[in-house]
Structure formats: structure tokens, C-alpha cells
Amino acid sequence: MSTAVRYYSRSGNTKKVAEYIAETAGVDAVSVDSNNAELSDKVDVLFIGGALYAYGIDENLKQYLKTLSGDKVGKAVVFSTSWLSKHALDLIKDALTNKGIKVESDTLYFKSKAVDGCRDEAVKFAKKYI
């Protein structure tokens, strides 16, 4: 099963969770603003994460989500970190659904300050989909 991990992080919290997931999947976690973020081949599972900034997701993540399509992504699994709320999960899920991409209903969320102790939970979550 092919897997990819993409994320956007300003503070490093979402990046840390992405790296835990990627390590479990045996792939690299790639920031959506990197030159190599584009999916060149179809993936069975795309883990995609971001956080809430001023009640929305970052513009880099918004633009990346617009590039995705159902012919490149079998299903998406969403994760987020935020000190404020889980609303980024819904925003990301909605953007993916609007692109015709199947999105798992189960998500992964950590409050920003709890990220340091989240490795085991992130690994357990990732293993459900790989």
C-alpha cells in the first residue's frame, strides 16, 4: 500500500506529528510548501495535516489542497494540532471532499502543548491506515 504524508506547520507542532506518522509508514513527511510536495504517483493513503490560524488554515495548505484530486489519492486521513480548536480538521476534510477525495471520518488531534507526549498515540493512529 502506498502512503504519503503532507503537512503545513508554522510552530513545528504539526510537523512533529507528521514525522511520527511518516516514520511509522516508512516515508518522509513533506511540507506542502516544499518543491517535492506534489504527488507524482497515486497514493492509497494520504495523511494530511495542518493547524488553525486566525480561524482558517494557512494559505499554503489551502493552495496545496486545491492541487489534489481523487485520481491521485485513494483516501485521505486528516490530522491537526492547535492550541485553540479542532476546526482545522473540518476545513481540511471539507476541502478534500469537495475535490472528490474519500476522507476517513476518524481524525487525529493534539493540543499544541501536548505534542511532545503524543508519539505513541500518533503511531497507533497511523497503523490503522497503513
Model regions and ranges:
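Acidic, amphipathic alpha-helical patches
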Residues: N36
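FMN-binding flavodoxin-like domain, especially the glycine-rich phosphate-binding loop
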Residues: T3-A4, S9-V32, S40-I130
